[in-house]
Design a protein with these regions (language model features):
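General beta-strand structural signal in soluble alpha/beta enzymes
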Residues: 6, 44-46, 67, 90, ...
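Solvent-exposed alpha-helices and their adjacent loops that cap or buttress functional pockets
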Residues: 36-37, 55-59, 79-84, 115-119, ...
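Intein/HINT protein-splicing elements and their conserved insertion hotspots or analogous self-processing inserts
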Residues: 25-27, 42, 48-159, 169-243, ...
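Short hydrophobic/aromatic beta-strand micro-patches
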Residues: 164-168
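Conserved phosphate/anionic-ligand binding catalytic regions in large, soluble enzymes, centered on
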Residues: 1, 124-140, 251-255, 348, ...
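Amide-donor transfer/coupling interface in amidating biosynthetic enzymes
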Residues: 263, 282-284, 288, 332-335, ...
Length: 505
């Protein structure tokens, strides 16, 4: 608690010369200052927004505070429910006789909560906001498909700042108010019952007309399972610590995650920042990239938004750079002469497709019939965990997997829909180049949103080159590891990076 620091962001109407309008942000800031002094917490930054007035329309006066505090990841807990039978209590904000928060007592309460989190007495915690206790509980149930049995009580009274926690031993908090316990499905309070679907639809559909949260399923998904084993023996000199070249273009944002996963797998990653501010910078970067590829065993194209996904399409900046003859020659030598590997994730996958490295295994000019990745069916960015099913283990990257294995991976993209002509899709299937597919909770490849987050044809999430040594996939396998996604069921590791490194040993 004592390490918390605040930032502020405001959005108010145009103030002009009206003293009353000036009083609105002043009152908000005085209130924020009063709370800061009471809690002994300082604000270290803020953002001043533009005018919130258009003609005669004003935005609702708003002051938002973001609270941040450093903590060991292993000590963090979830703010959503993950199992049934969890008993939930509300810890009210201590208040004085005038119903003003007693900040000193509230700070002491927060410190006690932290101690109980560390001791294991509290496994879940969240804060009541708009809608009171009921809204906070329901939102914490929806993510993992759980319900809740409410005890009789005042569920909708505003109780800003009250803490909702699961307690194994409620005697640690004599002031705790029992709220109820998690259930398999549905929400009940006395004789009132609301189904899970009703609650979920009410929560998700409020802004559905503005932010589409559904897309019609298009097409069928044939059986793409391919039984051939992966090529696991490297032709060439072995490497105790294979070298991995990771180019970081303007807009790339996953190079550090990718390097970390390779380092943990026993490789030696090298990140090279591509500079393009001047002609001299570009020439220098081209030479540096070519030399880095020449000393590498693996080239890994990380995710991000290279070049801001311009001009008119993702991955084009990377593809254009790697079509430079000096770079292209070294990359072809790596793949065709030195038996190297290449990997592209998300934006990197888009670059591999635009280069032709998947599905063709070589850099080649693209034609109208070439496979590509285009805009998601819901016409906006998606960011969520999805399940993928392994359809082929032809690639060395998937040597630790079996056909039919299912893994959870995070996706975050606006252009992830894989499309290709029918004959190209059939060729991928026959050659075992369909590596992974989006699947439902039963492990069946599907076109249904949100299991298939972008509408990819044949539910394709990842494909390989004909020999399997180049793999492109949309899911961010590099964003997995210990102490991540604590609000979700376990995210199983594909051992993708370990398999790529093992190929050279």
């Amino acid at each position: 608690f004592d390490a918390i620091r605040l930032t502020f962001q405001e959005f108010f109407m145009r103030l002009g010369t009206d003293p009353k309008r000036w009083g609105v942000p002043l009152a908000a800031l005085l209130g924020a200052l009063y709370a800061q002094i009471g809690l002994g917490l300082g604000a270290i930054g803020g953002k001043d927004s533009m005018s919130g007035t258009f003609e005669h329309i004003d935005v609702p006066p708003t002051l938002i505070s973001f609270a941040l505090a450093p903590e060991r990841a292993s000590s963090l807990i979830t703010n959503v429910f993950t199992e049934t039978g969890a008993k939930v209590y509300r810890l009210p904000v201590p208040k004085d006789a005038n119903f003003i928060p007693d900040f000193k007592a509230y700070a002491a309460l927060c410190r006690r909560v932290r101690e109980n989190i560390r001791s294991g007495n509290i496994a879940f915690a969240t804060v009541a906001e708009n809608g009171g206790t009921a809204a906070a509980v329901v939102k914490s149930c929806l993510g993992n498909g759980l319900g809740f049995a409410f005890a009789a009580g005042d569920l909708f009274t505003e109780c800003y700042g009250d803490l909702l926690v699961s307690l194994k031993d409620a005697s640690a908090f004599p002031e705790a108010v029992y709220v109820g316990e998690t259930a398999k499905s549905g929400f009940t309070c006395g004789k009132v019952t609301v189904s899970f679907d009703e609650a979920e639809n009410a929560f998700e559909n409020t802004l559905a007309k503005v932010f589409t949260n559904a897309a019609a399923a298009e097409g069928n998904v044939p059986d793409c399972d391919f039984a051939a084993k992966a090529k696991t023996v490297h032709v060439g000199a072995k490497a105790a610590k294979p070298r991995v070249f990771i180019p970081a273009f303007p807009g790339t944002n996953c190079e550090l995650d990718t390097a970390r996963k390779f380092r943990l797998a026993g490789a030696e990653p090298e990140i090279l920042v591509v500079k393009n501010r001047s002609a001299a910078d570009i020439e220098e970067s081209v030479e540096a990239i070519a030399k880095a590829i020449a000393r590498a065993n693996i080239v890994a194209f990380p995710g991000g938004f290279s070049g801001g996904d311009e001009p008119d399409g993702s991955g084009k900046f990377i593809a254009t750079t790697f079509r430079n003859p000096r770079i292209a020659d070294e990359l072809q030598k790596l793949l065709q002469v030195r038996d190297g590997l290449a990997l592209g994730i998300c934006n990197g996958f888009q670059a591999l497709v635009k280069l032709g490295l998947v599905p063709y295994g070589e850099i080649r000019p693209l034609v109208a019939e070439s496979p590509t990745l285009t805009y998601n069916n819901i016409a906006r960015h998606v960011s969520r965990l999805v399940n993928i099913r392994v359809a082929s283990v032809k690639s060395p990257w998937l040597s630790a997997c079996k056909v039919g294995d299912v893994f959870s991976v995070p996706v975050s993209h606006g252009e992830g829909k894989f499309v290709a002509p029918a004959d190209a899709l059939e060729s991928l299937r026959k050659n075992g180049q369909v590596a992974t597919q989006y699947c439902d909770l039963s492990g069946r490849p599907t076109m249904q949103y949100p299991f298939n987050p972008n509408g990819s044809m044949w539910a394709i999430e990842g494909i390989t080159s004909p020999d399997g040594r180049v793999l492109g996939k949309m899911g961010h396998t590099e964003r997995t590891g210990e102490n991540l996604y604590k609000n979700c069921p376990p995210v199983l590791d594909m051992h993708l990076f370990e398999s790529g490194v093992k190929y050279f040993k």
